[in-house]
């Protein structure tokens, strides 16, 4: 999958001049796609089917998160996590725009200058609530109508319902804030996760007999409430169960919020390796223990509960094949 960063007019012109899209055009799926949740997946699936039917590439039109979120707003996925998920759904190309570059375009300029001239869009696929153009003046119905006038096509994907109602990134964040991880997993299509490289910690867990994997939480990424979680760590295509503390490790008076994971039944060096950490269930809040011995006792209690949960969870229903 090709990824094109379009932050300036020069980037846009270079993309148009140097990118060899099919003469027959492309199917363009439009959206921010934060979380790439089940509603996004349904939209992209329809776009992919259309691209295969027409034998033309599937192009994702999206934005850099930093340029399109309000100040202080957190996102479910980093840009890199989003791109990984989009590739897994069959996208041939992702065009990532700086929102400031196009926010002042009229709705017709967006359609004609960006979608038609620059991307050579044959068919645009958008959600029912897609808005575009300066002041969000354009909607999905207008896009469909205007493309038809230009001998192109627009497809509108209706509202996707899941769980107790509509699926959205806002709904998923609310569930995660309440530690309703299973409910959020059904809406995301897989458990909430963090991708990143394992960093060197202080070695405190190792000294206690519970060596841990430490990962930072990107500042722009939505973070779960502090506490201890039953997790699954993916390393080199293999899955390992774990206990993860999200927080500051108050027993040892650390400061920055991060994740610290004790991997069950694992031996090996994972420092500096790229891993994915899935959050399965919340076990308890973060506690400051009066001694290392108390902490060790609690870790053993947490481990026992994690092993019980493994038997209770329907893993395939949340997109993981844990044996």
Where are each of the predicted segments found?
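Positively charged, low-complexity intrinsically disordered leader regions
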Residues: 1-26
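N-terminal catalytic cores of NTP/NDP-binding nucleotidyl/phosphoryl-transfer enzymes
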Residues: 17-73, 78
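Short beta-strands and strand-loop turn motifs
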Residues: 29-31, 61-62, 94-98, 123-128, ...
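Short histidine/acidic/glycine/proline-rich micro-motifs that form metal-
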Residues: 33-35, 65-67, 100-102, 129-134, ...
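Residue-level signal for inorganic ion chemistry
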Residues: 37, 86, 124, 184, ...
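Active-site-proximal cofactor/substrate-binding loop regions of enzyme domains
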Residues: 49, 56-120
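Classical nucleotidyltransferase
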Residues: 105-211, 290-294
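Phosphate/ribose-recognition catalytic cores of enzymes acting on nucleotide-derived substrates
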Residues: 150, 201-323
């Amino acid at each position: 999958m090709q990824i094109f960063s379009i932050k300036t007019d020069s980037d846009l012109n270079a993309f148009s001049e140097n990118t060899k899209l099919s003469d027959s055009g492309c199917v363009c799926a439009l959206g921010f796609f934060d979380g790439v949740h089940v509603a996004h997946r349904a939209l992209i699936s329809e776009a992919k089917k259309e691209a295969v039917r027409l034998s033309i590439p599937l192009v994702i039109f999206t934005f850099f998160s930093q340029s399109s979120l309000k100040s202080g707003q957190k996102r479910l996925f980093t840009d890199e996590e989003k791109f990984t998920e989009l590739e897994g759904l069959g996208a041939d190309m992702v065009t990532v725009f700086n929102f400031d570059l196009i926010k002042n375009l009229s709705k017709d300029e967006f359609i004609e200058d960006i979608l038609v001239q620059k991307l050579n869009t044959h068919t645009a696929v958008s959600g029912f609530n897609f808005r575009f153009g300066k002041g969000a003046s354009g909607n999905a119905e207008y896009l469909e109508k205007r493309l038809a006038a230009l001998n192109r096509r627009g497809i509108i994907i209706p509202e996707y319902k899941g769980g107790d109602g509509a699926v959205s990134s806002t709904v998923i964040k609310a569930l995660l804030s309440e530690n309703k991880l299973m409910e959020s997993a059904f809406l995301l299509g897989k458990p909430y996760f963090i991708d990143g490289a394992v960093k060197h910690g202080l070695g405190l867990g190792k000294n206690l007999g519970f060596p841990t994997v430490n990962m930072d939480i990107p500042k722009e990424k939505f973070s779960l409430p502090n506490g201890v979680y039953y997790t699954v760590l993916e390393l080199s295509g293999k899955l390992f169960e774990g206990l993860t503390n999200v927080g500051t490790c108050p027993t040892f008076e650390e400061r920055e919020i991060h994740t610290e994971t004790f991997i069950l039944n694992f031996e090996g060096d994972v420092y500096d390796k790229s891993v994915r950490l899935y959050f399965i269930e919340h076990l308890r809040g973060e506690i400051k223990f009066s001694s290392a011995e108390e902490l060790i006792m609690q870790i053993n209690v947490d481990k026992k509960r994690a092993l019980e949960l493994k038997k209770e969870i329907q893993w395939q229903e949340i997109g993981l094949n844990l044996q």
